[in-house]
Amino acid sequence: MTLAEKHVNTGKDGRITPRERILAVAADLYYRHGIRAVGVESIAEAAGTNKMTLYRHFPSKDELVAEYLRRLADKASSSWDRLAAEHPGNPRAQLRGWLQNMAAHVGSGNERGCALANAAIELPEKDHPARRVIEAFKTAQRQRIIDLCAAAELDQPEMLADELFLLLEGARVTAQSIGRDGLSDRLIRMGEAMIAAHER
């Protein structure tokens, strides 16, 4: 399943709407080639439509990029709800579940890093609508980890959350620059060691 297929919503009749098809194609192209490298003409052509239709649904490329990232952020945020359902009332298990999920993601063969982090590098302009999506997501993710660390009664929850956050971001860069061999196992071991170091 491609990134595009993972982020498609269908209409009432079960068919993919033009808007969703455009968004799905954009998601796939942006992730594989980078946001700056992909123009709206390429997206429209790959989606089997034209620029006029694209701009009818997305007033600008910036708005299309923002919606692409918003969908990714929503999907990532929903994973926290699944962890809470799998480990109700057990914040430490939820934290470890998140760590294991991230390790599996980093170790997967199609991992090109975090799409939101990649976008942040490509879009440094603070007033870009996509930048606000990225910052809101990363801030919320960090706060979620802080809350879990605090609920698990671990010492210095903010510091631990930052350590885990930086470990994950570093692992993503390592996966792209050096390779993935053994990376998932090392990520889990290091994360577990960080958690253990903050136990009361």
What residues fall within each predicted segment?
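Short, basic, alpha-helical segments at the C-terminal edge of helix-turn-helix-like DNA-binding modules
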Residues: 70-76
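Amphipathic alpha-helical packing segments from all-alpha helical-bundle domains
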Residues: 76-77, 83, 93-97, 126-151, ...
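Amphipathic alpha-helical segments used for helix-helix packing
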Residues: 93-94, 106-132
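N-terminal intrinsically disordered/low-complexity leader segments
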Residues: 1-17, 199-200
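Hydrophobic alpha-helical connector segments
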Residues: 67, 81-112, 151, 157, ...
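Amphipathic C-terminal alpha-helical segment
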Residues: 105, 147, 165-183, 194-200
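Helix-turn-helix
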Residues: 2-4, 21, 25-63, 67
